[in-house]
Structure formats: C-alpha cells, structure tokens
Amino acid sequence: MANIGKRLSAARETFDRDTLYTIDDAVAHVKSNAKAKFDETIELAINLGVDPRHADQMVRGVCNLPNGTGRSVRVAVFAKGPKAEEATKAGADVVGAEDLMEQIQGGNINFDKVIATPDMMPLVGRLGKVLGPRGMMPNPKVGTVTMGVTKAVNDSKGGAVEFRVEKAGIIHAGVGKASFTEAALAENVRALVDAIVKAKPSGAKGLYVRRIALSSTMGPGVKIDTSAAVSA
C-alpha cells in the first residue's frame, strides 16, 4: 500500500490538478501515469446536473466505442428455435431458455452480459433479483431485448458500453485500456461523451454536463474542460 501511495503522489506531480485539460491532453497524462503491473482500465467519470430520483431526469443508454473496450466479454442469450441458432452462430457464449434460467438460479453466472428475445422476457423477468443487482437485466432501451440477436451479440463483444447515472448524478464507465494508443482512447472518450450528451433527459434543467474526469485504475483523476469536450 505504501508503494501505491508513493506512485499516486508521484503521478499527481506530473500535471496540475486544478487545470482543465483538453481530452487529448488528459488522455496523455492518464496514459503516461498508468504504470501498474497490469493493463489498467481507463475510466471516465461525468457529473451531471440531474436528480435520478425523478424519472424524467434518468440518464441511461449504450455507446458503441469505436475502438472497443479491451475486455473479453462473455455473452448469454435467452432464445429458442431459429433465434437460438442465430445467437450461437453470432458467437454467444451461452444460449438457452429454461435451462439457462436454472443455471442462473443455481448461481452459475459465468458471463458478463445477458441478451433476450422479447418472447423470453416473462422467463427472464423471474431472474430480476439475481440479474438486476449485477446490472445484467436485459432492457430494450439499451438494445439487449431484441429480435436482432446477431447485432446485439456483435455489439456486446465489440465495444458496446452501457451507461446509467448513479444516485449522486455521476456516470462511471471504462473507455479502454492503458495499452491503447492515445488516439484510440481519445476517440472512445469523445464517443462516450457525445452519447451521454445525446441522452440528456427532458427533465434536466440548467447546466447538464458539470464535471468530467479521466483516470486509470490505479491513477489520479485528470480534469477535462467540459465546454471543449461537449462542443468537440
């Protein structure tokens, strides 16, 4: 822990913590300070001027990062018949119906994302208490309840990131790995910021995007100039 503290302190000395940086400069600082012995995730935190306790101020959506997430995502699909075959051909890791429900109820959740065809939702709905807290419950708003199984599987494995505002009005999401090039990370950051701006709810009043910060798993946060990022 002492070494982590020293490394964090040293990283903070490489940039001005009060300066608002462009996305490109923020990425450069964060990437240069990602020196852990593993490939750190680069994370974006956005403070929004919303109160998610009100339904008309909820912010939720999905963004297909142009350069992917750098993660290997295992996908489970609830489907039957031709759609189950389609899911398998698309590369889904687990495909099933009642058998998949029993697997999940038994605690065997060896996947990261769940997709379902609409006709499977009465079955999937019985798993709400298990999948909901894990953020894995299929939802048509983010494209995981769909007849377009192939696209949903490809998006999930190819870089789709779901975002949802937390109680404090903050969205946290990974935008890649420290091993990505600066250009790839910056492009991913811009794509996610743009998606969140487009997801502005009707009930949002006043300043919508209040603060943006970028960090690596073990590194300090670097502040981003919101006015430049939102208009970029």
From Swiss-Prot:
Gene Ontology terms describing biological process: regulation of translation; translation
Record flagged with keyword Repeat: no
GO cellular-component term (any): cytosolic large ribosomal subunit
Record flagged with keyword Ribonucleoprotein: yes
Functional summary from the UniProt entry: Binds directly to 23S rRNA. The L1 stalk is quite mobile in the ribosome, and is involved in E site tRNA release.
Oligomer status and interactors: Part of the 50S ribosomal subunit.
Name listed for the protein in its UniProt record: Large ribosomal subunit protein uL1
Species, as recorded: Maricaulis maris (strain MCS10)
